[in-house]
Amino acid sequence: MEKVIVRDLAKKFMWTIVTGDSNSLNRPLTLADTNRPGLELAGYFPDTQTKRLVVLGDKEIGYIEEQMDEISQRRSFEFLTGDNTPCIVIAHGHECPPVLKEIAKRKNFPVFKTEHQTSHAIVSITNYLDECLAESVVIHGELVRVFGVGVLITGKSGMGKSEIALELIKRGHQLVGDDRIDCYKIHDDLVGRTTPMLEGFMELRGVEEGRIDRKRLELSIYRMFKIVRKFNELRK
């Protein structure tokens, strides 16, 4: 599980900052879910998950402008800008309500604006946080995509995992990662990937580490196979 702060999201999605200084961007995010504060704007606060990032969309902004007086806004925004809440994101390019802007400035609370539609913003935020906050483990093995399905080959060192993966690649399947595989549990799914430094590389016993050229995959694999076969013949 990675440590994620508001600054990471603001940089990732290129949000426009409305309020909050550099220190306010260090607030942590510990939950992937977001909160569209319908009941909170209506003045009902029990059972609110305050650690969720708050998103204000068309409906919320419309309700604030048309149905809430200044007293109601102050009560709701004081609650929504609490210490546990990471930040507020205003979607669809809406302007920040003046009362929220005033309170957020006073509390040095981060408020952002994005041009993305509300649903798009929520999906993007949730997917990103799901991956960053997922439980993870490092496994020694080979991860290959076989007929569109991820296959993780594990076993003791030196038993031939890389050679098996190479045989699969020769037959048109895809290498995902060699040696070190980072496995994540996202909801009920297991997702595996290699580290960026090792992406596209394979290491075989007796052969220097070689790069799998995706644009010339068949030629690269054929050359590597010839090297491996020649090396094996020399060992006999």
Predicted features and spans:
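Glycine-rich phosphate-binding P-loop
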Residues: 148-176
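Charged, amphipathic alpha-helical linker segments immediately N-terminal to NTP-binding catalytic cores
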Residues: 84-87, 93-128
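Gly/Thr-rich phosphate-binding loop signature of adenosyl cofactor/nucleotide-binding cores
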Residues: 1-81
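Short, basic, glycine/proline-bearing loop/turn elements
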Residues: 57-65, 84-87, 200-205
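P-loop NTPase nucleotide-binding/switch module
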Residues: 128-148
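Structural motif
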Residues: 52-55, 86-89, 109-112, 150-152, ...
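Fold-independent oxyanion-binding glycine-rich loops
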Residues: 57-59, 92-93, 115, 147-149, ...
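Conserved nucleotide-sensing/catalytic segment adjacent to the nucleotide-binding pocket
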Residues: 177-233
